A protein has these predicted regions:
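Hydrophobic alpha-helical transmembrane segments in integral membrane proteins
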Residues: 31, 37-65, 83-90
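Soluble catalytic domains of enzymes that build or remodel membrane lipids, polysaccharides, and related
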Residues: 66-327
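Non-catalytic terminal accessory segments
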Residues: 1-50
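Generic structural motif
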Residues: 10, 17, 62-64, 327
Length: 327
């Protein structure tokens, strides 16, 4: 608010000098706008951040096996457990209860469990272990789940900290996908769930490795933390050695073709955390929020549940209930 007031005050002074006026109306305008900004931020911290919605979408895909008609997936993302201190401490319990109440076939977590360090996690082990779905919980790592935001240079310490995060997720009964895939079966039918490591800072992703060995014609659900990586999975790009930006996709077998995922789930952007009249900080980020489709592939980017800075205005936190239907 003080910055807003100062900005308008300087603007008003310039106008006063140019127009030879006697009153700096910028100060009054700055006072009003600054007061509005102050109350908006108070609202975002106290009322906006705790809000959570259950969003339901139906996604139609052409090659879904009959046994998976109506298959229900709950996606949650970016919970940032280090932000739930003090009066916010009850929110993770509410979120997990909401997920379990949906009785999904599969739960998918698309990254950023911690803010900075795995020290934030142990008190939530019992809670996260209570997530229940017929086919379990599958997860990928987000950029905050590595050591990029820690002041650590020793390679052994970095490896140990990252292993703690990975071991924690596995200790909760989650299936952590690190450039790999698993099959989910219903009788003779099956679908595949693949997941990649982080796309940037640090860059550990290998899309082709995650998909290698999946039968052609199979339905594939891909979990990727950062939505802009979705482009690497398009049919026109996925079997090239480099993507459209010239970055190496990372084929392990150059003589093998891999299947393009029909559906990708991502997070990372938090939908900007602040959205006013459709304007949000993340709007210039590719695929920052919502459902997208290109080349027969679909992406859903969720607004997530938390954030390193606990504030939300008009970008409500969410869990997403996805029902798969045959096209």
């Amino acid at each position: 608010p003080q910055f807003v007031f100062s900005l308008f005050s300087v603007f008003g002074w310039c106008c006063m000098r140019l127009l030879h006026g006697h009153r700096n109306w910028g100060k009054l305008l700055g006072l009003v706008v600054g007061a509005v900004a102050f109350f908006c931020f108070i609202y975002g911290f106290t009322e906006g951040f705790p809000k959570m919605q259950v969003k339901r979408i139906t996604i139609y895909v052409p090659n879904l096996p009959k046994s998976f008609e109506g298959y229900r997936i709950v996606q949650f993302s970016d919970i940032h457990l280090g932000s739930y201190y003090g009066w916010r401490g009850h929110l993770p319990q509410r979120d997990i209860d909401s997920i379990n109440a949906e009785k999904p076939d599969l739960i998918c977590f698309t990254g950023d469990l911690q803010n900075v360090t795995p020290d934030e996690l142990p008190e939530y082990q019992a809670l996260l272990s209570s997530l229940k779905a017929r086919d379990g919980v599958m997860s990928v790592l987000g950029n905050h789940d590595y050591t990029y935001y820690m002041d650590v240079d020793d390679e052994q310490e970095i490896a140990a900290l990252e292993k703690r995060m990975q071991d924690f997720q596995r200790s909760c009964g989650w299936r952590l996908l690190m450039n790999e895939h698993v099959a989910v079966h219903r009788g003779a039918d099956s679908i595949y769930v693949a997941g990649t490591e982080n796309y940037d800072k640090p860059k550990r992703t290998n899309v082709r490795k995650a998909l290698y060995g999946i039968r052609p014609g199979s339905f594939v659900l891909m979990l990727q933390h950062i939505p802009k990586q979705w482009r690497e999975t398009w049919p026109s790009i996925i079997n090239k050695e480099k993507d459209e930006d010239g970055d190496v996709i990372g084929p392990d077998r150059k003589d093998s073709l891999v299947v393009a995922p029909q559906l990708t789930l991502s997070g990372h952007t938090h939908a900007g955390q602040v959205s006013v009249l459709g304007l949000r900080p993340s709007m210039f980020t590719p695929y920052d929020y919502g459902l997208f489709e290109e080349e027969g592939c679909q992406l859903y980017t969720t607004s997530g549940l938390g954030g390193t800075v606990p504030i939300r205005i008009g970008a409500t936190a969410e869990i997403v209930v996805i029902t798969l239907k045959r096209k």
